């Protein structure tokens, strides 16, 4: 009883303290509400947990996450160890030639060798004595050497001398590190810009322009069998003259062109088809590689393959039939309604190398060019 009576005076004090704390809490909530309401009414932004401000100098108000992106890489320096076939070419900006590529500094000045990020070596120009004609064997750290050839294995000597020197391959072969075909087809960006084929201008039947005449080669043997059944006009050394600058004008008079390659290797489809035949609007007649190989790059009805016929005599008969049947002949040009042929240039090939080097920085070694290319 006495204990209970002694405790009673403490309870009123605790009630008073609790009441004061409650009133203080209500006041804080009330003023917070008034502040938020005022901000909403004036249009001022509510305070955020973290404000992300634009980075000074960043374009278009880029936020700070843009500053985390990798800094722009320095412009690559690419050395052409030689001009192809010792013939200088104009070098435009790669950003204008290859979509998505940045510009590279491309030069044939060998004095920049110690600073070059990559060196392009054109095989034809060093193949006679590779050991004497290659760049210095002590290369700067990280420098990549690119082996470059547009010739077939039949015309590339001393490949074995290059084992272990190169880091990338660059050629017409589709399995090259840098694929540089002689030509390709691309879609029209709009309506086809070329005029319809003028059949009345096609006054001749079959032509062939050949500079490297080898009597024992497969293409010469096939031609000799074919011309026994069909007239073929042959231009070049020891044949009909073809003055400089008149090739396209001359070949455009023909309905068909023998796009016979000088050697028979996979993917080796050269200017004989892309320029001599297609730019002259002549239907190409091809010998090798296989039809399936050609169809990797062309529609099946864009060319005539000799393998489709049992003999040269059968091919001759077919060409004579097409000569008289305009509708069937014109069917070999239907693909031009949606596609157009394009031809390579040295400058474009160098810019493809520029793009590849920008995209892939890993360092590798091609152990044997010969084992891969032959």
UniProtKB/Swiss-Prot annotation:
Q: Name one GO cellular component term.
A: Golgi cisterna membrane
UniProt catalytic activity: a beta-D-galactosyl-(1->3)-N-acetyl-beta-D-glucosaminyl derivative + GDP-beta-L-fucose = a beta-D-galactosyl-(1->3)-[alpha-L-fucosyl-(1->4)]-N-acetyl-beta-D-glucosaminyl derivative + GDP + H(+); an N-acetyl-alpha-neuraminyl-(2->3)-beta-D-galactosyl-(1->4)-N-acetyl-beta-D-glucosaminyl derivative + GDP-beta-L-fucose = an alpha-Neu5Ac-(2->3)-beta-D-Gal-(1->4)-[alpha-L-Fuc-(1->3)]-beta-D-GlcNAc derivative + GDP + H(+); an alpha-Neu5Ac-(2->3)-beta-D-Gal-(1->4)-beta-D-GlcNAc-(1->3)-beta-D-Gal-(1->4)-[alpha-L-Fuc-(1->3)]-beta-D-GlcNAc derivative + GDP-beta-L-fucose = an alpha-Neu5Ac-(2->3)-beta-D-Gal-(1->4)-[alpha-L-Fuc-(1->3)]-beta-D-GlcNAc-(1->3)-beta-D-Gal-(1->4)-[alpha-L-Fuc-(1->3)]-beta-D-GlcNAc derivative + GDP + H(+); a beta-D-galactosyl-(1->4)-N-acetyl-beta-D-glucosaminyl derivative + GDP-beta-L-fucose = a beta-D-galactosyl-(1->4)-[alpha-L-fucosyl-(1->3)]-N-acetyl-beta-D-glucosaminyl derivative + GDP + H(+)
Residues on the membrane's Lumenal side span 35-374
Per the UniProt entry, the glycosylated residues are 60, 105, 167, 198
Q: Which InterPro entries match?
A: Glyco_tran_10_C, Glyco_tran_10_N, Glyco_trans_10, GT10-like_C_sf
How does it sit in the bilayer? Single-pass type II membrane protein
Class of enzymatic activity (EC top level): transferase
Name the major location: Golgi
GO biological process, alphabetically ordered: ceramide metabolic process; fucosylation; oligosaccharide metabolic process; protein N-linked glycosylation; protein O-linked glycosylation
- Transmembrane region(s): 16-34
Q: Which UniProt keywords apply?
A: Glycoprotein, Glycosyltransferase, Golgi apparatus, Lipid metabolism, Membrane, Signal-anchor, Transferase, Transmembrane, Transmembrane helix
Localization: Golgi apparatus, Golgi stack membrane
Give a GO molecular function annotation for the protein: 3-galactosyl-N-acetylglucosaminide 4-alpha-L-fucosyltransferase activity
Pfam families in UniProt: Glyco_tran_10_N (PF17039), Glyco_transf_10 (PF00852)
The stretch of residues making up the signal peptide is none
Q: What is its EC number?
A: 2.4.1.152, 2.4.1.65
Alphabetical list of Gene3D superfamilies matching this protein: Glycosyl transferase family 10, C-terminal domain
Which protein family is named in the record? Belongs to the glycosyltransferase 10 family.
Function text: Catalyzes preferentially the transfer of L-fucose, from a guanosine diphosphate-beta-L-fucose, to the N-acetyl-beta-D-glucosamine (GlcNAc) of an N-acetyllactosamine unit (type 2 chain) of an oligosaccharide, or a glycoprotein- and a glycolipid-linked N-acetyllactosamine unit via an alpha (1,3) linkage and participates in the surface expression of VIM-2, Lewis X/SSEA-1 and sialyl Lewis X antigens. Preferentially transfers fucose to the GlcNAc of an internal N-acetyllactosamine unit of a poly-N-acetyllactosamine chain acceptor substrate.
Q: What is this protein called?
A: 4-galactosyl-N-acetylglucosaminide 3-alpha-L-fucosyltransferase FUT5
Q: Which organism is it from?
A: Hylobates lar (Lar gibbon)
């Amino acid at each position: 009883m006495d204990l209970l009576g002694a405790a009673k005076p403490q309870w009123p004090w605790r009630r008073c303290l609790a009441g004061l704390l409650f009133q203080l809490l209500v006041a804080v909530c009330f003023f917070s509400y008034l502040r938020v309401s005022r901000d909403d009414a004036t249009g001022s932004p509510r305070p955020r947990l973290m404000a992300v401000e634009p980075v000074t100098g960043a374009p278009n108000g880029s936020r700070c996450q843009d500053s985390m992106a990798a800094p722009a890489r320095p412009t690559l320096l690419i050395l052409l160890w030689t001009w192809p076939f010792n013939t200088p070419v104009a070098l435009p900006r790669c950003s204008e030639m290859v979509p998505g590529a940045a510009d590279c500094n491309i030069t044939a000045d060998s004095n920049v060798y110690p600073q070059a990020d990559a060196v392009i070596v054109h095989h034809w120009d060093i193949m006679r004595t590779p050991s004497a004609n290659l760049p210095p064997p002590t290369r700067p750290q990280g420098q990549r050497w690119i082996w470059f050839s547009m010739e077939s294995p039949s015309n590339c000597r001393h490949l074995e001398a290059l084992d272990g020197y190169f880091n990338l391959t660059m050629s017409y072969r589709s399995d090259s590190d840098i694929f540089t075909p002689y030509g390709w087809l691309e879609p029209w960006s709009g309506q086809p810009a070329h005029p319809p084929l003028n059949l009345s201008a096609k006054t001749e039947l079959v032509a062939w322009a050949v500079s490297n005449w080898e009597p024992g080669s497969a293409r010469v043997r096939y031609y000799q069998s074919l011309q026994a059944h069909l007239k073929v006009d042959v231009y070049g050394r020891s044949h009909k003259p073809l003055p400089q600058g008149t090739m396209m004008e001359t070949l455009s008079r023909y309905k068909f062109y023998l796009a016979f390659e000088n050697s028979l290797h996979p993917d080796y489809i050269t200017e004989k088809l892309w320029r001599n035949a297609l730019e002259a609007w002549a239907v190409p007649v091809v010998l090798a590689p296989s039809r399936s190989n050609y169809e990797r790059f062309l529609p099946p009805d864009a060319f005539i393959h000799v393998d489709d016929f049992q003999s040269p005599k059968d091919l001759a008969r077919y060409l004579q039939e097409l000569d008289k049947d305009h509708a069937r002949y014109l069917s070999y040009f239907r693909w031009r309604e949606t596609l157009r042929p394009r031809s390579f240039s040295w400058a474009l090939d160098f810019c493809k190398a520029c793009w590849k080097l920008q995209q892939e920085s890993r360092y590798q070694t091609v152990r044997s060019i010969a084992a891969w290319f032959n």
